[in-house]
Curated annotation (Swiss-Prot):
The modification Phosphoserine is found at residues 329, 356, 387, 615, 625. The keyword rRNA-binding does not apply. Expressed in flag leaves. Expressed in roots, shoot apex, leaf blades, leaf sheaths, panicles and flowers. Expressed leaves, stems, sheaths and flowers. Pfam families: LRR_14 (PF23598), LRRNT_2 (PF08263), PK_Tyr_Ser-Thr (PF07714). Residues 306-593 form the Protein kinase domain. The active site is at residue 433. This is LRR receptor kinase SERK2. The chain crosses the membrane at residues 243-263. GO terms for biological process: brassinosteroid mediated signaling pathway; cell differentiation; defense response; positive regulation of innate immune response; regulation of defense response to fungus; regulation of growth; somatic embryogenesis. It is a single-pass membrane protein. Belongs to the protein kinase superfamily. Ser/Thr protein kinase family. Induction: Induced by infection with the rice blast fungus Magnaporthe oryzae. Induced by salicylate (SA), jasmonate (JA), abscisic acid (ABA) and benzothiadiazole (BTH).
Amino acid sequence: MAEARLLRRRRLCLAVPFVWVVAVAVSRVGANTEGDALYSLRQSLKDANNVLQSWDPTLVNPCTWFHVTCNPDNSVIRVDLGNAQLSGALVPQLGQLKNLQYLELYSNNISGTIPNELGNLTNLVSLDLYLNNFTGFIPETLGQLYKLRFLRLNNNSLSGSIPKSLTNITTLQVLDLSNNNLSGEVPSTGSFSLFTPISFANNKDLCGPGTTKPCPGAPPFSPPPPFNPPTPTVSQGDSKTGAIAGGVAAAAALLFAVPAIGFAWWRRRKPEEHFFDVPAEEDPEVHLGQLKRFSLRELQVATDNFSNKNILGRGGFGKVYKGRLADGSLVAVKRLKEERTPGGELQFQTEVEMISMAVHRNLLRLRGFCMTPTERLLVYPYMANGSVASRLRERQPNDPPLEWQTRTRIALGSARGLSYLHDHCDPKIIHRDVKAANILLDEDFEAVVGDFGLAKLMDYKDTHVTTAVRGTIGHIAPEYLSTGKSSEKTDVFGYGIMLLELITGQRAFDLARLANDDDVMLLDWVKGLLKEKKVEMLVDPDLQSGFVEHEVESLIQVALLCTQGSPMDRPKMSEVVRMLEGDGLAERWEEWQKVEVVRQEAELAPRHNDWIVDSTYNLRAMELSGPR
């Protein structure tokens, strides 16, 4: 008996290490499979700029590679290779990235077909293959991506018909298949009923209701038949009276319906006039691309006549109201407050169109607008998690503080959104008021840049030279304040201040700091603490010990590079994105330190009472170490 028990114990002791090894192996299988899949992609692509140099197959998993983001379980959830000057072809192994949510390959020179295996990426939220050289058909399997919200395949050479399976994606919000060689009838059911001809433009062989061209053999486009309510049941004794009344009513309805249908048909033949000539109160269903023109009455009903109880916030451009549309969806309605001048309507509409064309997952999508002789309103999706500013400083007692990992995601996401405005919009869009209050948070706490384009929109009554400085004290770049001239580098400055808000949880301008003899400007306050080597005092107390020290230092370095006094010395937002992804920050910081060594002797004493212009003096080189 004793020998038998001893034998069982020995077997158990041998089995436990074996089980542990198997468990470790299993935990790495997913990461290794994903790493192999991404390395296959690297081998298939031509990388002229060595952006994939860090994709090393000898590493345990791909989570340390540049342009790859993983979740806490070390599974790949994001691949960002937009505008990387890549060529070559995609590989079917991409279908093994089971947890992938974002696949961004836009603005490259990738060719070949879109792999059917992408349909296996059932967690995908965004698929952006815009501006490449893809050929062949759109895979039918993409209809399996039931979480997809953002699909851009435009500006390629895709052919064949649009798969009807795509209509089953009920979550789809943004669709662009324009500028391809697609043919056949555009589906009009399911999610496709939301999309208008701009989503399918410049595909000469496409036809159907989603385009401006009817399909061969199909009747001309016509308005839907009028709704006929069911006839109520009447007793036999009233049948004759009902018949007579019904006949009179039918005749009257016909008398009024025929001219109305004819007028509607005539207007459908002239869609180019919809945007400019139709008053919103008379035709709320006018669209510009995917942009809806709402009636004022519709927005009054949605916001309970702009009730104060529905105010979400107030800003330099007006008040924002929470509203609920007739379909039940929640929206944020921005009621612009600028006075109206004659002749501004066309410019307003042009700027609204420009804003609507800026589509990126980190930009707040404009859903619609309303314009009357006395009102200008913009309609956006409602962001349930509010703004970064409200989450940092106005959260409810039951709301947890923003975790450090969430803050770093916000930093990167907002940088990507601003980079898109600067580098991918034509003409480029300068925000001019980048701050934590204008960075919104969606249901997944992803950063969404809001209020972009509004500064230009509100200057439509001015000349081409903008004379008004728009922005918020503490965020305004010194050159913008002194000259009134804005550029993308003024946005970079505001972004740097926003990073400091994320790190510290404090306001960019706060008179309350005077009570402790501190600087009212956040940038000056941060620099003062760094000079005193009190980096730990910078971190938001709400985080307690839940932050990564070297990541805090990296974010501070990026913030200081972004807030340099000279706009020429600040990085571009695209460079900021790369630095946040771990590419080039050490080199840029070292270069900055060398310059500071030269400047040290000439550095002036700090100013304590400069409340308007943020300090542009840089720190001594030794006051913040490089990455550890």
